[in-house]
Amino acid sequence: LACIVVRSAIVGGEGSQLAQAFLQRGISVVQEHPVHPDEITRLQSLAEKMHCHYIVNSLYPHNKAGRLWIENTQKIYQQIQQRPVWGQIITSRQLIYSALDIYCQAMKLHPNDITVTLEKDNTPLQFLRLSNPTGDLLLCLQKHLSSNDPDQHSLVMHHMILGWPAGYLTLAGSYGPVEWNNALYIHHHQDSKKAMYQSPATMELDEPLFHSFHTPPNSWQDVMECEAPEAINYLLAEIDKCWQLPNDKKPMILQPHYQLALSQLWIKTLQTAGKAIDGTIAPFKRMNFTKSSGRRK
């Protein structure tokens, strides 16, 4: 098995050529996203011909934060038997591929079921609507992309929220935190006999404000050394579990038709958003929240 992190042709790299070379030797390939649909079709066909596997890895759905956001979205639905009534994704051009993958997995949606429309062409964020048979979601997409340094200059990498009347589930960043915030709703709050200081606390007042499912690492170095490799190990373990299964028996996200449809949705989203503004974000001053500013005299 070869893991390829060299960029694919659509972002100016030779990753797909490397993938082809390995597949031609009968070596299965896991290739880093994004990959153009035409390349995926070609490489999937080659993998089938050579009796091996070709999989695109979007990484972020497989790290701890992504997995817990996906898992708890599905747990909430199972408990209350209701789809989210609202949602929002904020991300950048470089990371929209993985954001769409996280969303589809959490909602158990096939990418073919999603349509994309442009609501407002703004700067620095554009507003698009992702529609599916169960509802709509607002996508806030960064308009700038640095062609010379695409992996940097994201105003937001991943910020994803799904909301229900009972509260909302947040993936605050690519590596967390993942939190559930309870909605404020107190029964009989207009009854003075049941006011907070007139009677024992109600069940609603005893509820915690939020529940934390995952706290992110302390530093970007911890992410690079631990969290990202763990995400890749997780995906490889999932692949190993279904290595001998026919494609239609594998988990949906590892099936060729899902992987191709996700890339097609990615292209459709970028086409709807229109051409990015090529450039970098101005240098910024890093925040230091641990340094004491002292008291005023």
Where are these regions (language model features)?
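C-terminal glycine/acidic-rich active-site capping loop/insertion
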Residues: 171-253, 279
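Rossmann-like dinucleotide-binding domain that binds NAD(P)(H)
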Residues: 84-168, 173-179, 186-188, 287-294
